[in-house]
């Protein structure tokens, strides 16, 4: 019986960390429970919208403004593996392909690096303690020694989880008006009217991130103060100008999106 318990103990790392998500084969209609994820990344895909009489309402975000049915809404296919997701815009040729992080995984590279480091450490630790348990059981058959080692194993696991949590907490980007420089490309794709994206001198403003962006005159377009927040599982920015306008997105959302700009233009027209 004790031998079976030891074998089970050795497989704890696999049970804890080798959990695989249910694969999603290529399909034009993702699972309903995943619509919130896909319609954040691929908001222009037809599976996100319910269109009747030329008016389309978003299936995932009920408070989303209705839009007119037009070429903005494209046919898409989605494909999810255990470690990444892909969606294809199939209504144009050649197909446009976007690879994203799946929403089940927290999405920043630093986070994944930390997770991988601690997973490896925990796995080695479990196997090391498990091997010591087996050796002691065979050599001494000392129940007291085995109990001590089990307690040590539990303490090791709890301490490692605490250290991991503290490391992740320290790296969170708290609310602030200026995001870290490494994230400017992300923020300036979505909130390109925010003042932290521009370097203005003598009334002429140049984009800090996209060097090929033509210079523009300093005007109200870029006089918005923006507050950004980067949490572990989502990012959002608030445009502070006359009234608040909040946009929530996945932190790993692909850059150079055009659907958001197009949507804003259509809403302005409406």
UniProtKB/Swiss-Prot annotation:
It is found in: Membrane. Belongs to the asfivirus MGF 110 family. InterPro entries: ASFV_fam_110. Induction: Expressed in the immediate early phase of the viral replicative cycle. Keywords: Early protein, Glycoprotein, Membrane, Repeat, Signal, Transmembrane, Transmembrane helix. Its main location: membrane. GO terms for cellular component: membrane. Residues 1-26 form the signal peptide. It is a multi-pass membrane protein. B repeats lie at residues 147-270. The chain crosses the membrane at residues 118-138, 146-166. A repeats lie at residues 1-146. Plays a role in virus cell tropism, and may be required for efficient virus replication in macrophages. Glycans are attached at residue 75. It holds the Pfam family v110. This is Protein MGF 110-1L.
């Amino acid at each position: 019986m004790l031998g079976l318990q030891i074998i089970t103990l050795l497989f704890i790392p696999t049970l804890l960390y080798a959990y695989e998500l249910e694969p999603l084969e290529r399909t034009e209609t993702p699972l309903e429970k995943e619509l919130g994820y896909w319609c954040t990344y691929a908001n222009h895909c037809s599976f996100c919208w319910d269109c009747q009489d030329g008016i389309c309402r978003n299936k995932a975000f009920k408070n989303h403004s209705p839009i007119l049915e037009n070429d903005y809404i494209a046919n898409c296919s989605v494909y999810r593996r255990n470690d990444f997701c892909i969606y294809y815009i199939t209504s144009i040729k050649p197909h446009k392909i976007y690879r994203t992080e799946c929403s089940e995984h927290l999405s920043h590279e630093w986070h994944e690096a930390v997770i991988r480091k601690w997973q490896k450490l925990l796995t080695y630790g479990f196997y090391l303690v498990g091997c010591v348990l087996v050796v002691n059981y065979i050599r001494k058959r000392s129940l007291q020694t085995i109990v001590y080692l089990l307690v040590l194993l539990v303490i090791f696991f709890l301490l490692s989880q605490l250290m991991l949590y503290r490391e992740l907490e320290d790296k969170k980007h708290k609310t602030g008006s200026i995001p870290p420089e490494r994230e400017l490309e992300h923020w300036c794709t979505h909130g390109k009217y925010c003042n932290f994206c521009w370097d203005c001198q003598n009334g002429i403003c140049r984009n800090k991130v996209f060097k090929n962006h033509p210079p523009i005159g300093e005007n109200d377009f870029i006089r918005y103060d923006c507050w950004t927040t980067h949490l572990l599982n989502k990012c959002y920015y608030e445009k502070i100008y006359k009234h608040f306008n909040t946009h929530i997105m996945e932190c790993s959302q692909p850059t150079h999106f055009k659907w958001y700009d197009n949507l804003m233009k259509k809403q302005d027209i409406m």
